Amino acid sequence: MSIKNIFSKKKKYASVPSEQASQDVPEGIMTKCPQCKKIMLTKELDKNLRVCMNCGRHLQMNAKQRIDSLVDEGTFEEFNGHLISENPLGFPGYEEKLEKDREKTSLNEAIVTGQGEIEGKRAVIAVMDATFRMGSMGSVVGEKITLAIEKAKADKVPFIIFTASGGARMQEGILSLMQMAKTSSALKLFSEDQGLIISVMTNPTTGGVSASFASLGDYNFAEPGALIGFAGRRIIEQTIREDLPEDFQTAEFLLKHGQLDAVIHRAEMKETLGRILALHSTGGEREWLEN
């Protein structure tokens, strides 16, 4: 071996596993719980309302799964599903990302709105879907929520919204932030007309969504373990220079500090909503007592 070879650095290469090898769980067939790491058959998990059979973790639901689990069979009618986002600010790559999400989710936007019955009681229902642009709120999401509220007001039925969002959609800038005021104003008018508002916050409900319509219900509920907050935990800790409680920004923390009315298990959600709708319907108090 020459002197030159002794002092020369040997090249080291990192081995990158193939896509097939890197998959711990077969896609679509099995699902791993992000909390306890238990691997479950996806179809069994879906039957259990996507609640982990081992630790009770509430896994993410898409809008269709949520509606199917809540609304009486054959009663849901979607409206304004044709509305789609454009690119008002000319944000690079935004149209391509929207199109990719449309293909992946079969949705036009991050929310589905419609009307249906829960335990025989009519309501207008809005369900956000975090699989589309992380459920972010752009101008179309705000418009669909506002139109749904106005529909509930015109029909004199309750308005129920399930939130799941990373906050305002940055690609739409100020137009996205305007939806906070727009949706809040619509809820205010609906409330002044004696309309019933039920908000259910699911994981995650953050940013501008948590700071606007998500927190404006007559009843504010959440699912167990849901992340709910405005700014991120790290940002808050760096700002106040203090450590935050372990359960900070969880549904249970908010309930303990009076910011929620209840934390409701997914398996009990339909029955709970049905009882509240019955209570607020004509003769509802008598019906509630009889049940």
UniProtKB/Swiss-Prot annotation:
Free-text cofactor note: Binds 1 zinc ion per subunit.
Q: Which terms are listed as keywords in the entry?
A: ATP-binding, Cytoplasm, Fatty acid biosynthesis, Fatty acid metabolism, Lipid biosynthesis, Lipid metabolism, Metal-binding, Nucleotide-binding, Transferase, Zinc, Zinc-finger
Q: Which gene encodes it?
A: accD
Q: Which organism is it from?
A: Bacillus pumilus (strain SAFR-032)
User: Residues in domain CoA carboxyltransferase N-terminal?
Assistant: 29-291
- List where in the cell it is found: Cytoplasm
Q: Which family does it belong to?
A: Belongs to the AccD/PCCB family.
Which segments does the record annotate as C4-type zinc fingers? 33-55
Binding annotation for Zn(2+): C33, C36, C52, C55
Tell me the GO BP annotations in alphabetical order.
fatty acid biosynthetic process; malonyl-CoA biosynthetic process
Provide the protein name. Answer: Acetyl-coenzyme A carboxylase carboxyl transferase subunit beta
